[in-house]
Amino acid sequence: MRFRPIHGFLAVILFAGIVIVADMAIDGRFGRPPYERVAAGPDGQVRIPLVGLEPRQVRFFHFLNAANQEVWFFVGRDAGGQLQVAFDASEVCFKRKRGFRHEGEWMVCNQCDKSFRLAEINAGGGGCKPVPLQHQVVGGELLIAQADVLAGWRLFH
C-alpha cells in the first residue's frame, strides 16, 4: 500500500485530537459540574433563588459582565443548613484554573486534591481553601453585589 497525502492529513488530525483530549483531561475539564450562568441586574446585584438548595448540595455559577470579566463561584448548604459561598478558586492553586469539586460534606481542590469541610468555607483561611465571597440572604434569595464578585476576578484572568 502506498502512502497517500490523505493518510498524512488523517494522521495529523488524529494526533491533534489526542493532544486536545489529553490537555482537557489534565486540566480537569471532564467530570466538572455544569455552571449556571448569572449576571448582575440593573441594581448591581447578582440574585440567586435558594429554593431547592438542600443540605449537602452545591451549585456552581459562572458570572460574566459586559466587560467580559469572568468569575466562577459556588453556593452550597452544609449539613446544618447554613449557606456557604466562595469563589471556585483558592489563593494557592488559582493559576491552573481548575477549581473545586463537591464530594458529600467536602469541597476538594481539583489541582492538589486537598479537602475542606463545606461547613467551614465562609470562615476563610487562605492557602488552598476556597476564597469566601461576601453575600447576604434576603427572603429566599442570595444577593451578591457585582463589586464583590469582581473583587475575585484577579483569580480568573
Put a short name on every predicted segment.
Residues 4-24:
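Hydrophobic membrane-insertion alpha-helices, especially the h-region
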Residues 24-101, 132-157:
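N-terminal pre-ligand scaffold of iron-sulfur
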Residues 96-103, 114-122:
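Iron-sulfur (Fe-S) cluster-binding segments and ferredoxin-like electron-carrier domains
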Residues 104-113, 123-135:
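Short cysteine/histidine-rich metal-coordination sites, predominantly Zn2+-binding motifs
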Residues 107, 115-117, 142, 150:
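Solvent-exposed loop/turn segments at secondary-structure junctions
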